[in-house]
A protein has these predicted regions:
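Structured catalytic cores of large enzymes
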Residues: 74-251, 260-265, 277, 281-290
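Catalytic-core segments of thiol-dependent peptidases
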Residues: 84-103, 209-379
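Caspase-like cysteine protease fold
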Residues: 410-492, 498-499, 503-515
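Bacterial Sec-dependent N-terminal signal peptides
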Residues: 1-29
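Structural detector for internal amphipathic alpha-helices that build alpha-solenoid repeat scaffolds
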Residues: 477-489, 508-520, 541-553, 572-584, ...
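Short inter-helical turns and helix N-cap capping residues of alpha-solenoid HEAT/ARM repeat scaffolds
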Residues: 474-475, 505-506, 536-538, 568-570, ...
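Catalytic cores of nucleophile-dependent amide-cleaving enzymes
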Residues: 124-188, 296-409
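Amphipathic alpha-helical scaffolding segments comprising HEAT/armadillo-like alpha-solenoid repeats
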Residues: 459-470, 490-501, 522-533, 553-565, ...
């Protein structure tokens, strides 16, 4: 172990020394971008790499070549940090076979990833380049993967900050096609250089909404359409437009969407849908209005179920008895004709890599608001097919290496593209653990402006950013950036943010102010939530409802009931309000229901009161189980784990009390980690106090570490 540690430290120093040797001697005040590549990739594509590095000067930046000769993440991180400290490093392009940090014990830094870490390490870790771009985060090396040696596992330390604050941006240029990867890298870099010479303005934005996304709320779609016009205010005056495609425009919308993405005028695409690493999931079962259509869908459903069953004979008998359907329908499952028919039908619902390869995608930047589309550790990932095709104009993309949350501000600061800011300097201020830029992070529309440097660097003063917020001429996304910068410095108060949220005429700025308070999570967060719940911007109201379900302050109860009973509450807002509604004290909830107008009338109210009674009873069973002498451990673990999403106020003390009596270290570890999720709760100070009390009495190093981490998560 000692020799291993010594060897890693030696590599650390060598990498730092190498940076000073290969760095350009130009003035360090000029922003630099490191192109990090392995020696084999460099030997195959050196001409294109050098040309790409040289092209940085077209943006007024310096390119720096850094060849990874060791293949160890710690060495590269040290080298990048050295460049940041001494060479004004702005970002890094990870080109070719660069080692992949696989992060564990940091699920709170992701938007949605909450997998049990006892499962396979490849599946239960997050591939994340935050290891390379956030120098404040501290990690412990765990091991190198035996099957995929490019994967290195790290645990986020309890001594580390528990929030992402990237100092630089990073991107991956990594073709999925291993047989032709060097040719593809060469071709892509030449495409990127050409684009720098021919930069064009952004005139045409296309966004898409897939099946099952955001509860298929059309209010959410309309609100996004309106918001994009605010984020790109000159787009129509310049002869451009914002277009929208919904999944239900066609039974199979794939061809329409691919054709839209291939329109030569499309500059930027925002794609909201579900996904896998090699699939973009677009359509579900179509809406049909004829008996023939219903029967066709039903027969397809039964055939698919039969084929996936482990006991088809039993399932066949069950279907016949339950639905009274002909046996012939079920026998079709093994008919080659129907197997081929169903396969083609299923294939028509979604986008696969070969579909992308068959088109000429025009969008130069694409946001993949989907799970796993950027899973670059897999043998194939669909983002690669958009980037590495001579026919495609795509130069950069934003995507996720694991699953991602639906209800986030996906279009956050995207309007900075129209203000002359490059992709990297936009998204380094936004991303989560799983978020990655793929392709050229220095990509931008039109020419870069002074806002690019302001977005990328930290030396701009509070006065500078406050002036931006106060200006009537400044773009709303620049104001959003200013709010983010000030909030992360602790240079703007919660009360100031509430004032902005109350008085700004811009829905983008109001949302940015609310988001700033969500980062701070102050005692007055419930006031910001109440303002959000009354806002006419659907996304702000929706995020207000989401955070309300975490906060659960009694001051939110009346508004929650009003929205829950209001026939005009939009579908996705209602989804989150229901999560808050079920946490309200049963008697109080019934009283509020009975005193609030409800479009379903008195019968509807009584039905709702019965639901409240049932829910109250169910909650009592779960909480009573924690104090029972004959505790159901399986139910207890499920209940505790559920609080990572629910953060129920009435569960906080019972969970902490159970920790003191529990003898199972794995359950205690789960509790210690769960308490940290109460960061947005109105009981957050109490949760922190409970963690501190448990820590003072705990001797197990692993549990002490997790409690320490939870204290940091709540307090930072």
């Amino acid at each position: 172990m000692v020799s291993s540690i010594f060897r890693h430290r030696t590599i650390f120093v060598l990498a730092a020394m190498l940076c000073s040797i290969i760095s350009s001697a130009r003035p360090s005040a000029r922003a630099s971008v490191a192109v990090v590549t392995d020696s084999i990739t460099y030997s195959h594509a050196s001409s294109a790499i050098e040309e790409y590095i040289s092209s940085m000067r077209l943006d007024g930046k310096r390119g720096i070549l850094l060849i990874d000769r060791w293949g160890v993440p710690d060495s590269l991180r040290a080298a990048l940090k050295n460049l940041y400290e001494h060479e004004s490093l702005e970002g890094a392009v990870l080109l070719g076979d660069i080692p992949v940090p696989m992060i564990r014990d940091a699920q709170h830094l992701s938007s949605a990833f909450k997998m049990n870490q006892q499962r396979d390490w490849k599946s239960s870790s997050v591939p994340s380049d935050r290891f390379y771009d956030d120098f404040n985060l501290e990690f412990r090396f765990l091991k190198r993967d035996a099957d995929k040696p490019e994967l290195f596992y790290y645990s986020l330390s309890e001594d580390s900050p528990q929030r992402i604050r990237s100092a630089i941006y990073t991107s991956r240029i990594k073709p999925a096609d291993k047989a032709h990867k060097y040719e593809l890298i060469d071709s892509f870099l030449r495409k990127a250089v050409k684009a720098k010479k021919d930069a064009a303005v952004i005139n045409h934005v296309l966004f898409f909404a897939g099946h099952g996304y955001n509860s298929e709320s059309m209010v959410a779609r309309m609100a996004e359409y309106k918001a994009l016009h605010e984020q790109f205010p000159t787009i129509e005056t310049n002869g451009g437009k914002v277009d929208f495609i919904n999944h239900d425009f066609d039974e199979s919308v794939k061809d329409r969407l691919l054709a839209g993405l291939s329109e030569p005028s499309v500059d930027l695409a925002i794609l909201h849908h579900h996904g896998y690493n090699d699939m973009q999931l677009l359509n579900g079962s179509p809406y049909v209005s004829s008996p023939d259509g219903w029967l066709s869908l039903a027969r397809n459903y039964f055939r698919v179920k039969m084929r996936s069953s482990r006991n088809p004979d039993k399932l066949k008998a069950d279907f016949i008895n339950r639905y009274g359907i002909p046996a012939q329908w079920l026998e079709e499952a093994s008919d080659p004709k129907f197997i081929a028919q169903d396969s083609l039908y299923s294939r028509s619902m979604d986008i696969y890599p070969e579909d992308v390869d068959a088109h000429s995608i025009a969008a130069r930047f694409i946001i993949f608001d989907a799970c796993f589309n950027g899973a670059f550790i897999e043998d194939d990932y669909i983002v690669s097919h958009y980037l590495f095709s001579d026919k495609n104009s795509t130069l950069a993309a934003l995507a996720h290496s694991v699953n991602s949350l639906q209800d986030v501000w996906c279009d956050e600061m995207v309007g900075l593209f129209s203000e002359g800011v490059c992709a990297g300097n936009i998204y380094k201020n936004i991303w989560n653990l799983e978020t990655h830029i793929f392709g050229d992070p220095t990509f931008h529309y039109s020419s870069l402006s002074s806002w690019d440097a302001a977005a990328g660097r930290g030396e701009y003063s509070d006065k500078f950013w406050r002036k931006a917020i106060a200006s009537k001429e400044v773009h709303p996304d620049v104001k959003a950036l200013a709010i983010r910068k000030l909030a992360r410095r602790g240079s703007i108060t919660p009360e100031e943010l509430i004032d902005i949220q109350s008085n700004s005429s811009s829905e983008i700025v109001r949302l940015a102010a609310f988001d700033g308070n969500a980062e701070i999570a102050p005692d007055c967060f419930d006031k910001a939530i109440l303002l959000a719940l009354d806002d006419d911007y659907e996304l702000l109201q929706r995020l207000g409802a989401k955070f309300a379900s975490y906060n659960q302050s009694p001051t939110l109860a009346e508004k929650a009931v009003q929205l829950f009973l209001d026939p005009l509450t939009s579908k996705r807002v209602l989804f989150h309000i229901k999560s808050l509604f079920v946490t309200i004290d049963g008697e109080k909830a019934k009283s509020l229901v009975r005193s609030t107008p409800y479009w379903k009338g008195e019968d509807g109210k009584e039905s709702l009161c019965r639901y409240i009674d049932s829910n109250t009873s169910s909650k009592k069973v779960d909480i009573d189980n924690l104090s029972s002498e004959s505790i159901d451990l399986r139910s207890a673990k499920l209940f505790i784990r559920a609080q990572r999403n629910q953060c129920r106020a009435d569960a906080l003390d019972p969970i902490a009390e159970y920790y003191t009596r529990c003898s199972d270290p794995d359950i205690k570890l789960l509790i210690a980690e769960t308490l940290g999720w109460y960061r947005y709760s109105y009981l957050a100070p109490h949760a922190q106090s409970l963690c501190q009390s448990l820590l003072e009495k705990e001797s197990d190093p692993r549990l002490r570490a997790e409690l320490t981490k939870s204290i940091r998560r709540i307090s930072e």
